Amino acid sequence: QGEVIIAGKNLRTEYEEAKQKVALVSEKLSYFMDKTPLENGELLGVYFERWSMEELYLWLDRLEIPKGQPIYQFSKGMYMKYQLAFAMSYQPEFLLLDEPTAGFDPVFRKDFTGIIQDIRDREIGVLMSTHIISDIDQIADYIMLIDDGELKFSKTREALGNHSIQELIEQCGHKKTTVRDLLRRE
């Protein structure tokens, strides 16, 4: 129930305008798997008003993604990194991350925290769904728990006080809900 308003645009009634402002990273997205990251950028970038191949190059370098390798050869973690690079290349105002660290090795998971902080420093809003509490413990400034479509709590990180996020989640008997699940609800 309710509406989703993004940068003043109703997601249901002004979808085309809203989608230009939002990037989604989810393991369920697909690209031209037989193409390279750069080829995908050239083919798909035309659908985004603020697309920048220069940004794609910068993000591919930053995330150490091979530019000339077909995407089907990527590991799950590399595929998620590519999605982040692609998403940032159309310079969104909001970034929706659906289980973004799935498949990341422990070393990159640590780097990911810094990357998300850099994105937030650019004043890009970040909404992340995850079941890995350590991911949000370090970077979240506002935490919401949605259990089977129902909002269980919504608090600033500071308002949690001495309570851990894990503690609150366990008290609610949480079931996993992804960003994609939320966007499907009418």
Located regions from the model:
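Conserved ABC transporter NBD signature motif
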Residues: Q1-T13, E17-A18, K155
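ABC-family P-loop ATPase nucleotide-binding domains
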Residues: S26-Y82
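Catalytic Walker B motif of ABC-type/P-loop ATPase nucleotide-binding domains
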Residues: L95-E99, F104
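Helical segment within the ABC ATPase nucleotide-binding domain
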Residues: R109-R122
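H-loop/switch region of ABC-family ATPase nucleotide-binding domains
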Residues: T130-H131
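A short, surface-exposed alpha-helical micro-motif characterized by mixed small hydrophobic
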Residues: I136-Q138
